[in-house]
Amino acid sequence: MTAPGQWGTFLHQCLMHRIDATEFKSLLKLMFQKCPITETALLDALLQTRLKSRIKWDPLLPLYIDCLCRMGRVRTSTVLTSLLKYSSIHEDSQPLVPAAKEGSKGYTLMTDIRVIQDAMLSVSTGGTPKTIAEAIAIFFSIIDWIHAVVAWHHSHLDHSQHPGGLMSSPDVVSVFESLGILLAALSGTGKGLEVLSADSHEELKVKLGQALSAYLPLCVEVSLPLRNRLDGLQKEFHLYGEPSSKSLNVPMMDNVNVNALQFEASVMDGPVIHSRAGLYVYINAMLVGRPLVDDSMLINFLANRYGGHYEVLIEEIITAAFDVLSNAMYRNESSRTMFLFRSFLVNKLPPFFAAMLASTMVSIPMEMCISQALGRLDPNTFPSFSQMFEMQGNTVLSDVRQEFLFACASHKLIPESSIERMLGENPMQALPVGYNKDELVSQINTNPERAEQLINEIESMEGNAGAIVGAITEIMHNLCNQKETVTLKNICNSLSRRPQALDVILLFRSAKQVLQPLCGLLDSWHWDEDQGENQPVYDEFGSILLLVLAFKYRFDLRPADLGISSNDSFVLKLLERGSCSQKLDALDEKQNKNLGTWIAALFIAEGISEETMSACSPQEFYLLVATLFSQSLGACETGKLEFDTLKGGFEYLLEPFLLPSLVFALTWLGNHIWETEPEPSIALKALHSLVNPSSISGEGREIHRTVLHTVARMLEEQLKDVRTRHPSRTDIKPIMDSLEPCLSFQRVGSCHRSELEGWTTHAGGGLLGSIRSTFQALVLWSANPEVSMAPPSYTHRQVVAGIRMLGAARVFGALVDELVKLQTQTQTQTQAGSSDLALDLAATLVCAPLSEAFAVEQNSHHPVDPSKEALPRCAVLTLRDALALQHENVPKLAEKDPLRAEVVVRLARRVAALLAPPSQVPNLDVNNIIQNMQLGIEGSGPMELDGPGPAADDDDDAENIHRMIDNAAAAAAAAGMDSGVGVGVGQGTGLDTSIDDVLNAADMAVGNPEFLDLDMEGMF
């Protein structure tokens, strides 16, 4: 039997036996060893199998294709090309190849939609393309698909019917729309932009222009915003289906573009003006989600911005911090956000200023700087104590000025006696006791209970948070080194139940500085079966792990953020696979024995004994939790275990020493419910009993709340989807009600649905138009002489949403549009001076930190050792990247739009000046600041299967394949679990609905309420 024949038999058997994705991957390894095959032949075999089955929709098919892509066996471009070859889109229109006729009776569009959407997801998340060649190949595949869909439209036009053509088939509309989104997503990637920006791909751009010219007129009926987006793409890269009218013969000298040098030399810079909105935006960006505060980076930025003018620097950063608080109050931001802004002002800035004073030889009149900054504030927003009784409005910020001044006095920036004069009245509090980090460390070493007392004070507004954070993190490091886990457990418990304390910690330490020692301790945890009592060991291990998980889920941290550098790390394995169950035959002998022991302890014996725990280390237990739940729930669903017995066994996991394992158990359970199409009643009852337990201890209740915080958002999204599929169910709402108080746990910079709808429906052009409008308001505010005027409404979530949804290139283009407009107005003397303010604001936006790129930016100030750690990488195109691309394009841009080219050059110069390396900082020793003031001190894969022996005779091939498939199916049945690859997967729960949400959320009519929390962030 030929290789395609063997593969055809294998794939047919997989589909017939409903082999799930995990087992399919394992079987693929065997097949590739036994029978190598090219990617085109492999896809032909798979798609021909689909045609033979005559099934209109089989969710396994796109799942198998996705597995092949993820394993690197096939490329996205080849998938799209092969998919088109066998697509029923050719029906009643001229087929591209004869092969299509063979399946003309089969209906493939539902599969086509799903595969195209999977390709779009891979592109939007950075999975592909990895090379220029692959990007070009995907562009050509999209072009062919567009022509096929347009041909289908014309062949189905019937003027006697309405609607006709494209609009007569919802599935064809979905294919059409998905292709447009895929094209937009690909064009927003780094490789896609390189292809479209280069001069060497003229043939591709001509064909792409022809495809767009055919696509855009039809797109008006489908989605006007998508049409506008692709129209902008066509205009930006001149994709009109015709060869370029002229080639640029640019003179080169030693690989340097002479025209570019000449043009840039002719561009004159205007005066450097520090807009009030600049630092206002920068601080918003630092604190909008995970606190992105790195002292070296901040000092460097401020020193570059202000040079040696420290008085101006201090006055403006104080003013900006108060402006941020004022804006948050008027925007009705959450109390959690208000707390973080307030802590930055009161707890972060005073010691930060003290560090600057200690490191510079320049005398800085702090009292004058602070007085001038306070004089610029709106008295209605920050009233004095006496004014509080006269004001009818909001006085939530009445204490802030006083708190800030006392914190400054505590850090010796101003004398205590000057506070009354600066406030204009008698203060209503006394000077707090100032803390010293080293003294606090000594106190904790003497009395470990002092640590919890100090943690209680982290959230206070007395200017001591920095010293407390420094002491606590140093103690944690020491305890990790000494493996003193009893005290460490208590500290971790105190921190994990205080989410706001985690925010404050990141004002002074990076996540890596805090978590790397903890992850190292968990990875190297020593387990001795004869060590005596085991429950306390499980308790200590779980408490330390729970703090790591709280940080990870609150701030959406990546392994590099946690300080994990080894692929063998237990924590890494747990984060990647802890919520995935395993088949029984995939477990080794020790794992099988441990699983049986735990099942017996939970459901048969009187409880969890010391023998149960002594035979299984905490690391082994946590990696088995999902499988334990899978087997137990599977037994209950098949009638082998009573539900009351199941519930009683699961309740043992509510004991404090096992509670952290529920993070992975609930994650698995949520996925199982989402994947279970026919009847999820038992799983929902189990979930309700764990989310809302009937009884739990006081200590357990605190840990349980932290567990729910980490999983609530994911569970809510899954339950919403299940409720949509089963609207008559009444057992879902009680669970969602219990989760509701925990939904605000994350701080990742995502916007709210109401915000997104307001921006995307903006009359001036959707989300981009709203960003431009906000930019205009910030420039106007900076130019206004009324210095006490309240700041305009602003949240950096708007810019982040633009970057994640539309792409940095389009957001950057909108900023440049505004700069060009203001430059034109300046030349006509209608808006003199505003263009320089706008340039400063735009440069600050480009320099502002972004969570996706923060590790890369930090690496320029704190380089990692490449021999020990992988260099950090950024998964999205940032505003800095977009500026760099535009700057490279200046020679061509100067010929078509000289004014725009000038603006890009000026902006690039300003950004380069603001981001100049630390060595260029005058009169400021950054290392001394960091060291002296203790600010930011650095302190297994998929299952392997044995390959087959010598190749069997052809006559035995089919029998061998059948036996292999039968064994896999039998193993799946023996495991007693639903693989989640039934008909329900992909129907109403996958990208079929969220594709519309992507479009609607980005300039569209309706948005997904949790859109920015999805994995599709950054698609455009």
Swiss-Prot record:
Any one GO cellular component localisation term in the record: mediator complex
Name of the coding gene: nut1
Any GO BP: regulation of transcription by RNA polymerase II
GO molecular function, one term: transcription coregulator activity
The protein's assembly and partners: Component of the Mediator complex.
Keywords of this entry: Activator, Nucleus, Transcription, Transcription regulation
The protein's name: Mediator of RNA polymerase II transcription subunit 5
Xref: InterPro entries: Mediator_Med5_fun
Job description of the protein: Component of the Mediator complex, a coactivator involved in the regulated transcription of nearly all RNA polymerase II-dependent genes. Mediator functions as a bridge to convey information from gene-specific regulatory proteins to the basal RNA polymerase II transcription machinery. Mediator is recruited to promoters by direct interactions with regulatory proteins and serves as a scaffold for the assembly of a functional preinitiation complex with RNA polymerase II and the general transcription factors.
Statement: the UniProt record of this protein carries the keyword Glycoprotein: no
Keyword Lyase included in the entry's annotation: no
Entry's localization field: Nucleus
Species for this entry: Aspergillus clavatus (strain ATCC 1007 / CBS 513.65 / DSM 816 / NCTC 3887 / NRRL 1 / QM 1276 / 107)
Pfam families: Med5
Main subcellular location of this protein, as a coarse class: nucleus
